[in-house]
């Protein structure tokens, strides 16, 4: 499966959940392929990815989800899902928690929870019907639009959000292709 197809299908899925340009989607996970796939889909629709440290305790998870006004949370596993569920009542904007690993979550019962594989099934037909939607979304993104919100660790006070634009990301990607002797 090509990276553009993955991004396109993720874009359609995010749209299915009502994510639109400038809306935030949080990812609470260690580095893994699903993290990148979710991130590509959020950015393709013009949404803003909010990264959470896997070590954030529940109180910080609540603060970050509330402050960023995230609508969806991609969570790695039971540990991260438990943190989100503990503060769910204090995060009214959060409509869905999509988890990557099922271990330990079989008996959890919340309408806000969804398995990653279930999420991936959504939108396959929609993608076939709406391929132009993805190009429309991407064409609407401007280089100055925010792509990522990265929070500080909050050692001197509440965590603060640093916002990186699509233009910032494009410059970073360009530099990844340079030989290391050039920087």
For the regions a language model picked out, list residue spans one by one.
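Tryptophan-centric aromatic hotspots in well-structured domains and transmembrane helices
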Residues: 3, 35-36, 53, 63, ...
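Conserved AMP-binding/adenylate-forming
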Residues: 13-59
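Structural core segment of the AMP-binding/adenylate-forming
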Residues: 17, 44-122, 136
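AMP-binding/adenylate-forming
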Residues: 47-50, 65-77, 147-150, 158-176, ...
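Conserved pre-ATP/AMP-binding loop-to-beta segment of ANL
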Residues: 114-117, 124-151, 158, 181
């Amino acid at each position: 499966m090509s990276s553009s197809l993955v991004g396109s299908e993720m874009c359609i899925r995010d749209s299915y959940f009502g994510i639109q340009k400038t809306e935030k989607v949080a990812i609470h996970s260690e580095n893994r392929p699903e993290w990148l796939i979710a991130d590509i889909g959020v950015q393709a629709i013009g949404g803003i990815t909010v990264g959470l440290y896997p070590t954030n305790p529940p109180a910080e998870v609540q603060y970050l989800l509330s402050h960023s006004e995230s609508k969806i949370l991609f969570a790695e596993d039971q540990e991260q899902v438990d943190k989100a569920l503990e503060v769910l009542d204090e995060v009214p904007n959060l409509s869905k928690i999509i988890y990557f690993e099922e271990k330990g979550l079989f008996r959890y019962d919340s309408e806000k929870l969804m398995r990653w594989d279930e999420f991936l099934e959504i939108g396959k037909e929609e993608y076939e019907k709406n391929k132009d939607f993805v190009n429309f979304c991407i064409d609407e993104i401007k280089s100055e639009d925010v792509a990522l919100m990265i929070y500080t660790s909050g050692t001197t006070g509440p965590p603060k959000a640093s916002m990186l634009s699509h233009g910032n990301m494009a410059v970073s990607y360009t530099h990844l292709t340079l030989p290391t002797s050039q920087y």
